[in-house]
From Swiss-Prot:
Protein name: Protein IMPAIRED IN BABA-INDUCED STERILITY 1
Keyword Nucleotide-binding on entry: yes
Family to which the UniProt record says this protein belongs: Belongs to the protein kinase superfamily. Ser/Thr protein kinase family.
Effect of loss of the gene: Impaired in beta-aminobutyric acid (BABA)-induced sterility. Altered BABA-induced resistance (BABA-IR) against bacteria (e.g. P.syringae) and oomycetes (e.g. H.parasitica) associated with reduction in priming for salicylate (SA)-dependent defense responses (e.g. trailing necrosis and pathogenesis-related PR-1 gene expression). Reduced primed to be primed phenotype in transgenerationally primed plants exposed to a second BABA-priming.
Keyword Amino-acid biosynthesis included in the entry's annotation: no
Lipid addition sites, N-myristoyl glycine: 2
């Protein structure tokens, strides 16, 4: 970092003169301190001397005395002959405290230098104003990634803000482990840590990385990108090369997936996000590891079974999942829970033999052991996808249930897949794509979801929805939405909608967004017949949403009225539907004016008469619903919506106390749906649904009243 370009840097301090004063070597005015290198021999002597003398040391030594002792080292890093003389005495017992103080003086926060000083060994932090954040480009469990610009040079970098608790030493050590591992690795296919942004008083840090334009998840999800076999081999070769470098240095990544494999415009793939990485257990150190690592779709079976002793083979399973995803175009193992993920693995790759379960010491082995043995169908499944034998052989090796059969990254690089034609292409020959990351893929999915929701509508809505859908509407997945066919009739030059869904409700209508409001439609979902929130069986098709009203002088049969009632049959009372009308606001206002001119103002007596007729009609419907033999396809009540004119009439009637649900003798809920008592729908859920519909109706009424003014 800064001017410390060598990974072999050992010195922990800036150069110090004999007076104990820091001698700052400024690089291009950046204020970064040059750290001199010490040869390995001197480093070994210092460390051994520290370990032997540190415990015995009790006296303190001033900074100037220590400075003069360090001054015996020449600026070239070579120890002078006097270092070996007995007259030179290092009081290394307090050296660690001196180094902590030196790191704080260099700009590091005390909570970091006290707990994880080795992670920032020899580095100087960037200033907080050295970079300008532009936008977020990634989001992880423990971090957020931003695109940023270096203020001095204008260079684009990636800033990773790590989440941790600086008051908890273990949390700080967990964060610092990523820094230690990244400093240990140096490979073209491993992301490079360029520095750290923090200050003495800061409670957070930002890691500075080189900027990469793409990740594999974003490229795979792009509809315009289709990888060829040489391109896939190129990416896989780079991935395995980077992992081979990690494993050779005892590092497990433990979170290999498409979004952590970054690609730049030069076609170079780099393994990133070492937040869950750890060192492999040495033969003499069997410290238990956690099994709660690796994203679920890429997690190997031994971790799903609770293994606490594992090695680099966990990364190879994840590589196999990524490889199959590159070839097929989507993840091959998409479980929603750990149990389901394990079941999918056994069905595809086969379950382990009986000896594996007997010898296994995994905590969850007997708990998750399948009752029947699975032979696996991986080869047959991949052959159906048109993959070659070389492709299938490598995938089968990487996706072996038993870890020792997966081989290593180096053996995978010399497999038949890479040695047969067509060979891997050169990274420089890869096409330059538009920036594509996982977050871009999510945006595309959201846009597609909005389009699908918008296509469920045939008409355009001239007014914005007045409220968000209920909470239970947000829980319905998009794939559960079923679209019902709708028919339209042309009347008076306008499109009039007749629903053919027998039990469509107001909840359904509130779910359907307009085509020109796609920006607001991300939280609105379509509903269907099966989405009615009652737990009981709905065997009666009834009207819902708003009550019906119709002024009629002649008595008409209720059954024929139910069959024929539609907006076309009552043009004098029902205005254009707010949810399905294709008219604009201007057309709606013109229609209202025409109706007012044609019919004139309603008197209070007429309103009362109309509402009495309405209540009478609903009572007849209720009695009809009491008879089981009256249920039939011809008795479906078509849902209608109340116009502004009807609402005004109801408002006047409400003032006179003639609302049906306010009568003490006959209580009828006009917000529907009306269900037969004989079918015993849960009373609590029905009351909850009724309250929701009343609130929704009130919001629609209020909006209609405002627009009428």
């Amino acid at each position: 970092m800064g001017c410390v370009n060598s990974k072999q840097t050992v010195s922990v301090t800036p150069a110090i003169d004999h007076s104990g004063v820091f001698r700052d070597n400024v690089c291009s005015g950046s204020g970064r301190i040059v750290v001199e290198d010490l040869p390995p021999v001197t480093e070994t002597k210092l460390l051994s001397w520290w370990s032997k003398s540190g415990k015995k040391s009790s006296s303190k030594k001033s900074g100037s005395e220590l400075g003069s002792d360090f001054g015996e080292l020449s600026e070239s890093g070579r120890a002078s002959s006097n270092c070996r003389s007995e007259s030179v005495s290092f009081r290394l017992g307090n050296l660690s405290k001196y180094l902590e103080a030196e790191q704080v003086a260099a700009g590091w926060p005390a909570w970091l230098s006290n707990v994880a000083g080795e992670a920032i060994h020899g580095w100087v932090p960037f200033r907080s104003d050295a970079f300008e954040k532009l936008e977020k480009i990634g989001q992880g469990t423990y971090s957020s990634v931003f695109r940023a610009r270096e203020t001095e040079t204008g260079r684009i970098v990636a800033l990773k803000k790590v989440r941790f608790d600086n008051f908890e030493p273990e949390s700080v050590r967990f964060m610092a482990r990523e820094i230690l591992i990244l400093r240990k690795l140096n490979h073209p296919n491993i992301i490079k840590l360029e520095g750290i942004v923090t200050s003495k008083l800061s409670c957070s840090i930002h890691l500075v990385f080189e900027y990469m334009e793409h990740d594999l998840t974003g490229l795979l999800s792009s509809p315009d990108i289709d990888f060829t076999t040489p391109q896939i081999k190129c990416y896989m070769k780079q991935l395995l090369s980077g992992l081979d470098h990690c494993h050779a240095r005892g590092v497990m990544h433990r979170d290999i997936k498409g979004s952590n494999l970054l690609v730049n415009n030069e076609g170079i793939l780099k393994v990133a996000d070492f937040g869950l990485a750890n060192f492999c257990n040495a033969s003499g150190n069997k410290q238990p590891l956690t099994s709660r690592v690796v994203t679920l779709w890429y997690r190997p079976p031994e971790l799903l079974l609770g293994a606490t002793e594992y090695g680099a083979s966990v990364d190879l399973w994840s590589v196999g999942c990524v490889f199959a995803e590159l070839l097929i175009g989507k993840p091959v193992l998409q479980g929603r829970t750990e149990v389901e993920q394990l079941h999918k693995i056994f069905k595809l790759c086969g379950s382990p033999p009986e000896d594996y379960w007997k010898k296994s010491k995994l905590p969850h082995a007997m708990l998750f052991k399948p009752q029947q043995h699975y032979d696996g169908c991986l080869r047959e499944t991949l052959k159906l996808k048109g993959l070659s034998d070389a492709d299938i052989n490598l995938i089968e090796t990487l996706l072996s249930i038993q870890p020792h059969k997966r081989g290593t990254a180096s053996t995978a690089l010399v497999s038949q897949y890479f040695t047969s034609k067509p060979f891997a292409c050169d990274p420089s020959s890869l096409p330059v794509y538009s920036p594509s990351k996982e977050i871009d893929a999510k945006h595309r999915e959201d846009t597609t979801r909005k389009k699908i929701s918008g296509n469920g509508r045939r008409g355009t809505e001239s007014r914005k929805p007045t409220r968000k859908p209920p909470a239970f509407a947000k829980l319905a997945p998009a794939e559960d939405v079923r679209h019902h066919s709708q028919k339209f009739q042309k009347r008076n030059g306008h499109s009039v909608h007749n629903s053919i869904d027998s039990d469509s409700t107001l909840f359904e209508k509130m779910q359907k967004p307009s085509n020109h409001e796609k920006d607001e439609a991300s939280h609105v979902k379509n509903a269907s017949q099966g989405d009615v929130p009652f737990s009981g069986p709905l065997q009666v098709s009834v009207s819902s949403g708003f009550a019906w009203a119709k002024r009629r002088k002649d008595d008409i049969c209720v059954r024929s009225h139910n069959r024929s009632l539609s907006r076309g049959h009552i043009p004098n009372l029902l205005g254009p539907s707010p949810a399905f009308s294709e008219n604009t606001d201007v057309d709606s206002k013109n229609n209202e004016k025409e109706k007012e001119e044609k019919h004139g103002e309603r008197t209070d007596s007429q309103d009362r008469e109309a509402y009495e007729m309405l209540k009478l009609s609903m009572l007849k419907k209720w009695r009809q619903l009491e008879r089981p033999d009256s249920f039939g396809g011809s008795d479906e009540y078509h849902s209608q919506e109340l116009s502004l004119e009807l609402y005004q009439r109801e408002e006047k009637a409400a003032k006179l106390g003639h609302l049906g649900y306010e009568d003490n003798d006959e209580k009828i809920e006009f917000s529907g749906p009306l269900l037969s008592k004989s079918y015993g729908v849960d009373e609590l859920l029905e009351r909850h649904e009724r309250q929701i519909r009343q609130l929704v109706r009130k919001s629609w009424f209020q909006k209609g009243k405002k627009q009428g003014k």
